[in-house]
C-alpha cells in the first residue's frame, strides 16, 4: 500500500458517488468512492481540490483511502 500520496481531484460525480484523483507524482489516476470521502468526514470533493491519501490495491485496481484535504 502506498501512503501519503499528494494529488488533486480530477473529477467527482456526487450522483454516482465516485470519481478520480490525479497523483502529483505522475502516477495513474486513482478511483475514489463516497465511502472514503465520508470516512474522512467530508460530504463531497471539488474538482482540482488538493488531497493527501493512501492507495489500497484490490483485485488489481487502485482505490484512494484515508483521504485528507491538503
Swiss-Prot record:
Q: Is Cell division among this UniProt entry's keywords?
A: no
| Name of one Pfam family that matches | CSD
The set of disulfide-linked cysteines is: none
Q: Boundaries of each CSD domain copy?
A: 7-67
Q: Which UniProt keywords are present, listed alphabetically?
A: Activator, Cytoplasm, DNA-binding, Transcription, Transcription regulation
The molecular function GO annotations come to: DNA binding
Entry superkingdom: Bacteria
Q: Which GO terms describe its cellular component?
A: cytosol
Decide whether keyword Transcription regulation is in the record. Answer: yes
Q: Which PANTHER family match?
A: COLD SHOCK DOMAIN CONTAINING PROTEINS (PTHR11544)
Listed name of the protein:
Cold shock-like protein CspA
Query: What is the organism field in this record?
Result: Rickettsia typhi (strain ATCC VR-144 / Wilmington)
Q: What is the lineage of its organism?
A: Bacteria, Pseudomonadati, Pseudomonadota, Alphaproteobacteria, Rickettsiales
Amino acid at each position: 500500500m502506498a501512503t501519503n500520496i499528494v494529488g488533486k481531484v480530477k473529477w467527482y460525480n456526487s450522483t454516482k458517488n465516485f470519481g478520480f484523483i490525479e497523483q502529483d507524482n505522475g502516477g495513474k489516476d486513482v478511483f475514489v468512492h463516497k465511502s472514503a470521502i465520508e470516512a474522512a468526514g467530508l460530504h463531497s470533493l471539488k474538482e482540482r481540490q488538493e488531497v493527501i491519501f493512501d492507495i489500497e490495491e484490490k483485485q488489481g485496481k487502485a482505490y484512494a483511502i484515508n483521504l485528507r484535504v491538503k
